[in-house]
Amino acid sequence: MILSDKDIFDYVNSKRVLIEPFNSKFVGPCSYDVTLGSEFIKYKDDVYDLKKSLSHNKFEIENSIMICPLNHHLDETIIKNYKEKYNVNCVVSGGLLGTTNEYVELPNDVCAQYQGRSSFGRVFLQTHQTAGWIDSGFKGKITLEIVAYDKPVILYKNQRVGQLIFSKTLSPADTGYSDRECSKYAGQKSVMASLIKKDFEIDEEE
């Protein structure tokens, strides 16, 4: 059962669901809009070896970032020109991890799903790849996997990037996400790189 706008207000006001900060203007008919934070991660590895720690740079923007497609040629001169012409803080190409401003806490009988905005899809910008599902009992900010597929796209801090759709489960989970020992991203308050190397099935193969 998907929560309507009335349900979302009820769950937030009764503190069954925490969204911090909460903006009543961001409540849709059956969703809640979330906004882009200022912290990002860019991987440095030539190959993603998922049994090892992934090398990355974590950085913060003041206002805006230009995201270019993977094969878009960038050098120091082009980056400088883009920054001056479009007044952006940062220019990157390829995939990028970001995070929402919103910190969310779900009870054990509510799960959620993140969906990117349709307006972003219309400029071929995707803000999540496969990680749109949020288990019941989750606590933390939502990590975004951002890719531009056509032309460079400029994103701005605090703009709405997607929405959360909340669903009521038939019964509460015995153990919520943040209470499971194997949950790698419980309580995340910033953008986090992949921790897939911690997967138990990988360890068992050693």
UniProtKB/Swiss-Prot annotation:
Active site (UniProt): E145 (proton donor/acceptor)
Assigned EC number: 3.5.4.30
Pathway field: Pyrimidine metabolism; dUMP biosynthesis; dUMP from dCTP: step 1/1
Coiled-coil annotated residue ranges, if any: none
EC top class named in words: hydrolase
Residues with site note (Important for bifunctional activity): G132, W133
Binding, dCTP: R117, S118, S119, F120, G121, R122, D135, T143, L144, E145, Q163, Y177, K184, Q188
Domain of life of the organism encoding this protein: Archaea
Keyword list, A-Z: Hydrolase, Nucleotide metabolism, Nucleotide-binding
A matching Pfam family: DCD
BP-aspect Gene Ontology terms: dUMP biosynthetic process; dUTP biosynthetic process
GO terms for MF: dCTP deaminase (dUMP-forming) activity; dCTP deaminase activity; nucleotide binding
Stored InterPro entries: dCTP_deaminase, dUTPase-like_sf, dUTPase_trimeric
Catalytic activity reported: dCTP + 2 H2O = dUMP + NH4(+) + diphosphate
Family in the record: Belongs to the dCTP deaminase family.
Stored PANTHER family: DCTP DEAMINASE
NCBIfam families attached to this UniProt entry: dCTP_deam (TIGR02274)
HAMAP family: dCTP_deaminase
Subunit comment: Homotrimer.
Role according to the record: Bifunctional enzyme that catalyzes both the deamination of dCTP to dUTP and the hydrolysis of dUTP to dUMP without releasing the toxic dUTP intermediate.
Protein's name according to its UniProt entry: dCTP deaminase, dUMP-forming
Organism in which the protein naturally occurs: Methanococcus maripaludis (strain C5 / ATCC BAA-1333)
Gene: dcd
